[in-house]
Design a protein with these regions (language model features):
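Cytosolic juxtamembrane helix and N-cap/initiation of the first transmembrane helix
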Residues: 1-26
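Membrane-interface helix-boundary motifs at transmembrane edges
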Residues: 5-8, 77-85, 110-112
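Residues within membrane-spanning alpha-helices of integral membrane proteins
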Residues: 13-20, 62, 92-96, 119-122, ...
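Hydrophobic transmembrane helix segments
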Residues: 21-64
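Aromatic-anchored segments of alpha-helical transmembrane domains
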Residues: 23-26, 94-103
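Juxtamembrane helix-break-helix junctions at the cytosolic face
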Residues: 70-89, 93
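Membrane-helix boundary connector in multi-pass membrane proteins
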Residues: 99-119, 134-137
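Membrane-water interface at the C-terminal end of transmembrane alpha helices
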Residues: 124-139
Length: 139
């Protein structure tokens, strides 16, 4: 089965590897471009100390995301089919709940939440991961 066919069939192994790679790239980007991410979230009219804290926060967020990507890839490679599907389903649900809570919490702070074009892709990707796991759990 080709990679495209595996993706179309929502093979949990393929989906988990893709999600892991996306998470790794996102974490690396956030870490490398922490200054840009901090400015987009907190604005440019903040003190030097606040800017340093905001950039550090963004770097930590990037570092936090990278192991999640590695965990997703590792689970895709080492678990058997049934457990991989279960992991895809439940890890997707947990991350979806986390992101919902995260974005709701961020609205209560001075942090400028990302615009809708940055919010939809993670939710869509996690939805695909959850559905992939659900579809293959019973097989």
């Amino acid at each position: 089965m080709s990679l495209v066919e595996k993706f179309k069939s929502l093979d949990p192994k393929t989906i988990m590897i893709v999600v892991g790679i996306i998470a790794m790239i996102g974490g690396i980007d956030t870490n490398i471009n922490s200054e840009t991410w901090a400015e987009s979230a907190w604005g440019t009219e903040i003190s030097a100390e606040s800017k340093n804290i905001a950039e550090t926060y963004e770097k930590i967020w990037g570092v936090f995301i990278m192991p999640l990507g590695m965990l997703c890839i590792t689970a895709a490679l080492v678990l058997d089919d049934k457990n991989r599907a279960v992991m895809a389903f439940y890890s997707g649900c947990v991350m979806l709940a986390f992101f919902i809570g995260f974005f709701l919490f961020m609205r209560t702070t001075d942090y400028t939440s990302p615009s809708i074009e940055f919010i939809i892709p993670p939710f869509a990707i996690l939805g695909i991961l959850i559905f992939s796991g659900y579809k293959h759990m019973q097989q």
